[in-house]
Amino acid sequence: MRLILLGPPGAGKGTQAQRLVHHHGIVQLSTGEMLRAAVAAGTPVGLKAKDVMASGGLVPDDVVIGIISDRLDQSDAKNGFILDGFPRTVPQAEALDRLLKSKNLKLDAVVELCVNESALLQRVESRVAEMTARGEQVRADDTPEVLSKRLASYRALTEPLIHYYSERGKLLTVDGMMPIEQVTRDIYRVLEEAIGASDVQSRGKGAG
């Protein structure tokens, strides 16, 4: 099973990714972690990334794709993967498609966790109010104002990507505002319906 999990800040993406990893024996591929590992290992693409990062620049897409390519060749990725943090743009999605095609692999699905932004913001406001009432310090990056900016940034960046995968029949949407267990069940259900993953539901029953 080869998946991309999309969702804005606060959608619970990390929790759901870990559940899928645990129940299906697949790996979570975080571009940040892969970059750091490639740099530490001194691979050719890792050395390229190191030079760029040392100068304070953004790592080019072709270098990131090279690192993903190397990672997909490792034995633990043979059962499948969940990509985390990539792609973020349509050109990156196109490059990923070309990479997978070159390895005779295909992307099974892109799962988007949808959220009600105003409800998310209300949750944060309530939490901040409770912490303030208890005299606890609120982190500067854990405020409604910061979350609002992050949500707007995510929306602007991801909408073209969602359209790209929707056009290709890969996009599956799940309500990320439900309780964690319900979101997990819904992800298993849409995956089973979309790609015929008959063991998704049965293997997912132990989630929790």
Swiss-Prot record:
PANTHER family: NUCLEOTIDE KINASE (PTHR23359). Monomer. Catalyzes the reversible transfer of the terminal phosphate group between ATP and AMP. Plays an important role in cellular energy homeostasis and in adenine nucleotide metabolism. It is found in: Cytoplasm. GO terms for cellular component: cytoplasm. This is Adenylate kinase. ATP binds at residues 10-15, 127, 178. It comes from Nitrobacter hamburgensis (strain DSM 10229 / NCIMB 13809 / X14).
